[in-house]
C-alpha cells in the first residue's frame, strides 16, 4: 500500500485567530460514514467524525500558525507553513501528499494540489475535519478568555 497523506487547512478566510492545517494518513479500510468537506458538515457531526478519524487514522499531524505571525508573513505563506508543519509531524512519512488546492513548494514530500480535493478525496476530507475542529476548539478557548471573540469569525 502506498502511504498517502491528505492535507487541508481551516481559518484562511477568517478575520481573527490562527490558521490550522492538518495532514492525515488513513488505512486502506476505514469506517467514516458521513465524511465530507468540513464546511458541509454540522458542528456536532464534525465532532463525531473527528473522534472517528483520530481513532482510525494511521497518523495525524497538525500545524498552527498564530494570528501575529499571519500578520507578519501573510495568510498564504502562513497556510503553506502550517501545512508543511502538519506534514512534518506524520509518522510514517508519506510517499505522497494530496493537498487541497495548490501544491506545496517543498522537496520534503512529493505532493499534488487537487482543486476541491476536500469535496472529492476522503483523506483530504478527513484532514479538513481535523483542521476545522482543532481551530474551532482554539477559538472557543479564545472566546472564554476574551468574551465576544467568536463574533469576529
Predicted regions mapped to residue ranges:
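RNase H-like, Mg2+-dependent phosphodiesterase core
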Residues: 1-153
Amino acid at each position: 500500500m502506498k502511504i498517502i497523506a491528505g492535507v487541508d487547512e481551516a481559518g484562511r478566510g477568517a478575520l481573527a485567530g490562527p490558521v490550522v492545517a492538518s495532514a492525515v494518513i488513513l488505512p486502506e479500510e476505514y469506517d467514516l460514514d458521513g465524511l465530507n468537506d468540513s464546511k458541509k458538515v454540522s458542528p456536532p457531526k464534525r465532532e463525531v467524525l473527528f473522534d472517528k478519524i483520530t481513532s482510525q487514522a494511521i497518523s495525524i499531524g497538525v500545524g498552527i500558525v498564530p494570528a501575529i505571525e499571519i500578520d507578519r508573513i501573510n495568510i498564504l505563506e502562513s497556510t503553506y507553513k502550517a501545512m508543511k508543519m502538519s506534514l512534518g509531524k506524520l509518522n510514517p512519512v508519506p510517499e505522497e501528499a494530496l493537498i487541497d488546492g495548490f501544491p506545496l513548494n517543498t522537496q520534503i514530500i512529493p505532493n499534488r494540489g487537487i482543486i476541491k480535493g476536500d469535496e472529492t478525496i476522503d483523506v483530504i476530507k478527513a484532514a479538513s475535519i481535523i483542521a476545522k475542529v482543532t481551530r474551532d476548539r482554539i477559538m472557543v478557548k479564545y472566546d472564554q478568555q476574551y468574551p465576544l471573540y467568536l463574533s469576529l469569525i
